[in-house]
Amino acid sequence: VKSWDVIVVGAGIIGLSLAIELRKRGASVLIVERGEPGHEASRAAGGMLVDSPLETPPVLQSLATASARMYPEFAHELELESEMKVDLRDQGAILFPDEKHFGHPAIHGQMKAHAISLLDIQQLEPELRKDESDRVELELARQESFPDNSVEEIEILFKSVRGRALYLKERSVDPRALTTAAWKTAKNRGVDFSSGDPVTAINISDDQVSGVTTIKTTFLAEKVVNCAGAWSSQLGPHPIPTRPVKGQMLCLAMHPRDLIKHVIRTPDVYLIPRSDGRLLVGATVEEAGFDKRTDPDTMKRFHQAAIELVPKLAEARILEDWAGLRPGTPDNLPILGSTSTPGYYVATGHFRDGILLAPITARLMAQVIHHEKPDYDLTPFSLSRFSPMSS
């Protein structure tokens, strides 16, 4: 009977990235996926690689920064092996902040960003809406460049007429292309796949993992990793407090293709341009169970918000809309590491950061599975933080 060194449950970007990393280390790997690889939260994601302290929980900052730095090599490797592009863009983001971005004590003294003026914004994105006072200011404005500033300095700048937004040096990637490239790479590397057959049980023999049972069959392995995202809580042997958090998204066709060049984030909506001319508008954060239906009123609101920001988008064709189910946890931080059952590991609960954290999660989990000291302390992400009995 065939067996594997490791079974990974879930073929989202986390499971795929981990399987590739394990194959690099010589392990035989089987991925068991309830549906189609990469077709749940990974496919529905926006793909903003946000590691700014303005928007990243402090305890997650080191992992987010490390993973963001890994992305060029990570994406390049997937592109080479899959012979397809993942649309990793270095365009940066324009953030129109609200008060909470400046009030969080964790970011003071850490944040490095460019405060940009109305004139800067006009030069970066000429199609952003301007009201009459903006036009007057633009006529009076003269070019001023701001160096990297601390949060305190940026806050002062924002109290002047010049400070309108922040420019953040960050990347974005196309999650659909990324997950397809990761799936192709995993197959090329010799990862085995079982799709369309949900896992119903993690099998334990003599207090040690022995494999998984699906609706159709049983697969054998001495190590199993739960990467099942929003469905992680449905697998034993330990209670895993994940829940689905719905995110709806609208997709428009820009004309011309580079109508918007940067990611644009406001307190209400974000716009994510793709190199092929698509523009993603999102996203909701909803507690709606496993319901993946989109809401017409929400799509209208997204469309109107996009037009408010960029009037020319009134002419943009609506291509599609969708919803995905992010894996949330009680503290909205991931669950990473081993458990008290030998051979059973968990890498789930990445909430809104699964795409960003895929490279570092794969590296750290591979280290844990091979009984090496991980590059970063995973104690804050241990399953045991929810209950002493659950680890």
PLM region descriptions:
Residues 47-156, 305-307:
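Dinucleotide-binding Rossmann-like beta1-alpha1 core, especially the glycine-rich loop
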Residues 2-14, 30:
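Beta1/beta-strand and adjacent pyrophosphate-binding region of the FAD-binding site
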Residues 175, 312-391:
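C-terminal catalytic lobe of FAD-dependent flavoproteins
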Residues 20-25, 47-49, 53, 84-89, ...:
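Active-site substrate-recognition segment that forms the wall
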Residues 154, 158-160, 164-215, 219-223:
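Helical element adjacent to the flavin cofactor pocket in flavoenzyme catalytic cores
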Residues 62-65, 99-101, 165-184, 293-298, ...:
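Short beta-strand to alpha-helix junction loop
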Residues 23-44:
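Glycine-rich FAD pyrophosphate-binding loop
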